[in-house]
């Protein structure tokens, strides 16, 4: 290590496994930005469920070991590399990706994945924008081709992506239905864009949704737990309806016949299949929402960096998650 190299605290993963493989190190070198790169002093980093799958080694994208998790940071620009003209030291920013990892006191990001954070949003909220809001945009507009006047059911609406989908869909003129598993979650879903909310722990909630949507059915379903809900989703759709799968934790058996009569479709969402141009389109939508005030990230559980393993444990095993889980530096 070069003499005088600045050091930071960061979470490092040296082997795939359970939450216990997240190790705090205090002697990690602060990265130096190269061309088209931005170094950010991290104030908060969002935790996404997919990061637990990556950590366990079971996800389709496996990073080289060792690595630092985290994509959604919010903070202040510390320094910039050559050919960066959009940002300067001191700018408040958030990201949709990082090069060096976000569970750290400093994070390196490519300049095209960095966006300005308005003063009206704090750093915790900034750390809740990246994957949740960009995924919701991709699900609604790229995958579902949703448009004003249609109906959307956000199946599992109280988490980060679900609340983002409710806010965006409401702002764009859709009729929004949501589900949540707790009274608190239902209240938050109604406060963030849903016209109606249903308790998905109620044994008869599917019947309640059917009563609400009538014979026509619902046009779009944004599905957060497909391995539990997909079969029921197909029975709720309108003719030409679309189920968009954002989350899944296992397999499920469905009857393909349920897709035939209504010519319904099932599509998956992978945010990082988006092109740079698509990311910019999503960013324009979200930045407009920030300016107009309908992008309002809801913060759930908050943890210090040292409790990252506990955060990973809770984000998967705690029931009734409300809002976005964040690490604070």
Swiss-Prot record:
Gene Ontology biological-process entries: protein homotetramerization; quinone catabolic process; xenobiotic catabolic process
Enzyme category, top tier: oxidoreductase
GO cellular component: cytosol
Chain positions with N6-succinyllysine modification: 296
Transmembrane regions listed in the UniProt entry: none
Keywords assigned: Acetylation, Cytoplasm, Eye lens protein, NADP, Oxidoreductase, RNA-binding
Tissue expression as described in the entry: In guinea pigs it constitutes about 10% of the water soluble proteins of the lens.
Catalytic activity line of the entry: 2 a quinone + NADPH + H(+) = 2 a 1,4-benzosemiquinone + NADP(+)
GO MF term set: identical protein binding; mRNA 3'-UTR binding; NADPH binding; NADPH:quinone reductase activity; structural constituent of eye lens; zinc ion binding
Main location: cytoplasm
UniProt keyword Transmembrane helix, yes or no: no
Residues recorded with modification N-acetylalanine: 2
UniProt modified residues of type N6-acetyllysine: 23
Pfam families: ADH_N, ADH_zinc_N
Location of this chain's protein in the cell: Cytoplasm
Enzyme Commission number(s) from the entry: 1.6.5.5
Binding site for NADP(+): 53, 158-161, 181, 200, 229, 246-249, 269-271
Function summary: Does not have alcohol dehydrogenase activity. Binds NADP and acts through a one-electron transfer process. Orthoquinones, such as 1,2-naphthoquinone or 9,10-phenanthrenequinone, are the best substrates (in vitro). May act in the detoxification of xenobiotics. Interacts with (AU)-rich elements (ARE) in the 3'-UTR of target mRNA species and enhances their stability. NADPH binding interferes with mRNA binding.
Illness: A genomic mutation causing the deletion of 34 amino acids was clearly associated with a hereditary nuclear cataract in a line of strain 13 guinea pigs.
Subunit structure: Homotetramer.
Family: Belongs to the zinc-containing alcohol dehydrogenase family. Quinone oxidoreductase subfamily.
Name assigned to this protein: Quinone oxidoreductase
């Amino acid at each position: 290590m070069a003499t005088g190299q600045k050091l930071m605290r960061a979470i490092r993963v040296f082997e795939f496994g359970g939450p216990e493989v997240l190790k705090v190190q205090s002697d990690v070198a602060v990265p130096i930005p190269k061309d088209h790169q931005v170094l950010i002093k991290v104030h908060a980093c969002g935790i996404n469920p997919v990061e637990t799958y990556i950590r366990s080694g079971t996800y389709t994208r496996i990073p080289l070991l060792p690595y630092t998790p985290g994509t959604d940071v919010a903070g202040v620009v510390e320094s910039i590399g050559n050919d960066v003209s959009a940002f300067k030291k001191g700018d408040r920013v958030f990201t949709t990706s990082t090069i060096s990892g976000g569970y750290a006191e400093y994070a390196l990001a490519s300049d095209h994945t960095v966006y300005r954070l308005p003063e009206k949003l704090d750093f915790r909220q900034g750390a809740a924008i990246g994957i949740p809001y960009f995924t919701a945009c991709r699900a609604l507009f790229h995958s579902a081709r949703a448009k004003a006047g249609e109906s959307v059911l956000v199946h599992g609406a109280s988490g980060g992506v679900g609340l983002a989908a409710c806010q965006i869909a409401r702002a764009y003129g859709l009729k929004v239905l949501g589900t949540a598993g707790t009274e608190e979650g239902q209240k938050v879903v109604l406060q963030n864009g849903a016209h109606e909310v249903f308790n998905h722990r109620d044994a008869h909630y599917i019947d309640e949704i059917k009563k609400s949507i009538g014979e026509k059915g619902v046009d779009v379903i944004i599905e957060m737990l497909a391995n539990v809900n997909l079969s029921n989703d197909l029975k709720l759709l309108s003719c030409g309806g679309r189920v968009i799968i954002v989350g899944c934790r296992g397999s499920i058996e469905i009857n393909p016949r349920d897709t035939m009569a209504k010519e319904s479709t099932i599509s998956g969402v992978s945010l990082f299949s988006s092109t740079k141009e698509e990311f910019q389109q999503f960013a324009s939508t979200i930045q407009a929402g920030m300016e107009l005030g309908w992008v309002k990230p809801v913060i759930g559980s908050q943890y210090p960096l040292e409790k990252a393993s506990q955060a990973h444990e809770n984000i998967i095993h705690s029931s009734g998650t409300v809002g976005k889980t964040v690490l604070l530096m």
